[in-house]
């Protein structure tokens, strides 16, 4: 099983931030969830109240996608026609994309083509420089450090990062897991901690903007802030200075599950 992280920044003019989040969750997400080979899909919408704290979100959100293997990305299966993927029983989704012929004839357009057209009017895909802060794309395998239970109401922080110049990928991943991971596991109030290590073979398949990402869960923003002022957080941050390039991409959110076909929910 592989995971893909895709950062999200809203289109600069098409919607307010509130409208962006609503459309992403109610239209674009369910549309992409029709992709047959997609096993699981979770959206993360950065919380408005988190922008005044630390860590502060740098993105409006992020999506995570689960696929069976890297072969799905290497050799994507043919995409179904839109009117085969989205049916009348899908009601609102059908009327929005199929009934309206929103991006073209639904009998000719594929689901993938429709998703991409919808993507362009929802997210910031402008080529204006600087580009670094706009892009977050990582193909990885997860390594669970703290295997605790979570609930939908918990706060989740995602950090996406690149290794410090001079570190080979294997050196970076070894220290991240064996040293940094153990430091992170000691954070007060932490319920679950997952590292996601980029796959070396994936770099040749699609461009990756970072070398990995971490996911960490707390009960609420107050618990996160209490953890941030702890000696354990200071030790983690000090080690991070030897490991990561800065700034990182950051999302502070709650999980919104759009699709889940995996047994046990993880």
Residue spans for each PLM region:
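Macromolecular interaction modules
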Residues: 1-266
């Amino acid at each position: 099983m592989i995971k893909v992280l895709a950062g999200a920044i809203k289109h600069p003019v098409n919607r307010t931030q509130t409208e962006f989040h609503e459309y992403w969750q109610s239209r674009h997400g369910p549309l992409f969830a029709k992709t047959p080979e997609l096993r699981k899909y979770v959206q993360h919408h950065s919380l408005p109240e988190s922008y005044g704290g630390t860590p502060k979100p740098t993105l409006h959100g992020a999506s995570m996608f689960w696929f069976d293997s890297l072969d799905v990305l290497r050799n994507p299966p043919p995409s179904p026609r839109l009117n085969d993927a989205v049916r009348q029983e899908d009601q609102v989704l059908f009327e929005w994309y199929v009934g309206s012929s929103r991006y073209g004839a639904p009998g000719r357009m594929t689901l993938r083509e429709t998703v991409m057209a919808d993507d362009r009017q929802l997210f910031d895909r402008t080529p204006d420089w600087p580009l670094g802060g706009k892009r977050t794309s990582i193909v990885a395998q997860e390594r669970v450090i703290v295997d605790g239970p979570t609930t939908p109401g918990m706060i989740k922080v995602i950090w996406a990062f690149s290794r410090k110049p001079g570190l080979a990928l294997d050196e970076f991943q070894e220290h991240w897991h064996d040293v940094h991971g153990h430091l992170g596991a000691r954070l007060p109030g932490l319920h679950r901690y997952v590292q996601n290590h980029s796959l070396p073979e994936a770099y040749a398949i699609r461009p990756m903007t970072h070398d990995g990402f971490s996911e960490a869960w707390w009960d609420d923003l107050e618990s996160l802030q209490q953890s941030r002022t702890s000696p354990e957080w200071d030790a983690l941050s000090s080690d991070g200075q030897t490991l990561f390039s800065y700034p990182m991409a950051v999302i502070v959110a709650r999980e919104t599950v759009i699709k889940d076909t995996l047994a046990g929910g993880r």
